[in-house]
């Protein structure tokens, strides 16, 4: 699910190179994650770890977590040891914005803040859009 992340970051870096975008302002990488995949797949942490390297830096990525609180039909308390899936963003001291995923205006507000921060500081930003599964999924307890 998260295998596309390094591909997107590489494409972003290439477009910045070919547009002579040395300030990394013209092309912004945007990654959309599920809550369990963001916290549970190592490729996200690897991308965070490489973000600060000169040859891999894209000027910051905007990460949006679509957090339905039941990733892969697993309750959050069994899926990770931290309270929020977005805690992984603390690795690079990224600001983490939590919002109600069922309130489009709240999500847009967070997105505007994220873009402004990214453009000003050239750092990653994480938006945790918390929602819930409206139709229950069959699971075993």
Show the residue positions of the predicted features.
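Conserved small/polar residues in nucleotide/adenosyl-binding loops
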Residues: 133-141
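Conserved phosphate-handling catalytic cores of large alpha/beta enzymes
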Residues: 76-79, 96-126, 131
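A broad detector of short, well-ordered amphipathic alpha-helices
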Residues: 87, 108-112, 139
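Generic hydrophobic alpha-helical segments
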Residues: 14, 121, 140-141
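Charged, amphipathic alpha-helical interaction segments
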Residues: 52, 116-119, 138-139
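Cofactor-binding active-site loop characterized by glycine-rich and histidine/acidic residues
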Residues: 1-96
């Amino acid at each position: 699910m998260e295998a596309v992340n390094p591909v997107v970051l590489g494409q972003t870096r290439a477009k910045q190179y070919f547009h002579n975008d040395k300030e990394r302002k013209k092309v912004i990488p945007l990654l959309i994650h599920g809550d369990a995949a963001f916290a549970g797949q190592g490729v996200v942490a690897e991308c965070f770890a490489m973000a600060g390297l000169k040859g891999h830096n894209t000027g910051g990525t905007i990460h949006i977590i679509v957090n339905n609180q039941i990733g892969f039909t697993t309750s959050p308390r069994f899926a990770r040891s931290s309270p929020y899936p977005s805690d992984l963003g603390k690795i690079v001291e990224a600001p983490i914005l939590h919002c109600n995923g069922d309130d489009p205006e709240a999500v847009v507000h967070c997105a505007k803040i994220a873009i402004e921060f990214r453009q000003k500081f050239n750092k990653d930003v994480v938006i945790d859009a918390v929602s819930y599964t409206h139709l229950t999924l069959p699971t075993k307890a």
